[in-house]
Amino acid sequence: EYRRQRQMCIRDSYDGDVMSDMVSTAFGSLAMMTSVLVAPDGTTEYEAAHGTVTRHYYRYLQGEKTSTNPMATIFAWTGALRKRGQLDGLADLAAFADKLEAASLDTIRAGVMTKDLAGLVEGPAPKAVTSEDFLHAIRARLEA
């Protein structure tokens, strides 16, 4: 049984994990999905739905270039920053979160993305970049 509230589907933890993994496959990458956990007292936690990508992290520690998609992590941070801005009345912090999200999405729309997304694009081939290069591209848009 589930309840719908706005555009959310509220589930028990395990069922929610399974359902969210299934839904994410329809969009091509679990790395594009965040999770927001809200306690009855209003405490809120934002996280990347995919958890950690230890295989890529260990490669990175060995000096190898990786193409891990950081979008879910970025959006977990922006969600938390926006919430903190709302709670503390810091409009500039919430605005920064919005600007970072827009810069991230605009980078992908411009055809610069990590390998997992580049493989899903039909038509002209996008530029598949490393995680670090993707973050640099987002930063360049953010600072423009």
Positions of predicted regions on the chain:
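Glycine-rich phosphate/nucleotide-binding loop
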Residues: 11-99, 106-107
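Proline-rich intrinsically disordered, low-complexity coils
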Residues: 1, 40, 70, 124-126
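Single conserved hydrophobic/aromatic residue that forms the stacking wall/gate
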Residues: 1-9
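Internal helix-turn-beta structural module
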Residues: 62-68, 83-144
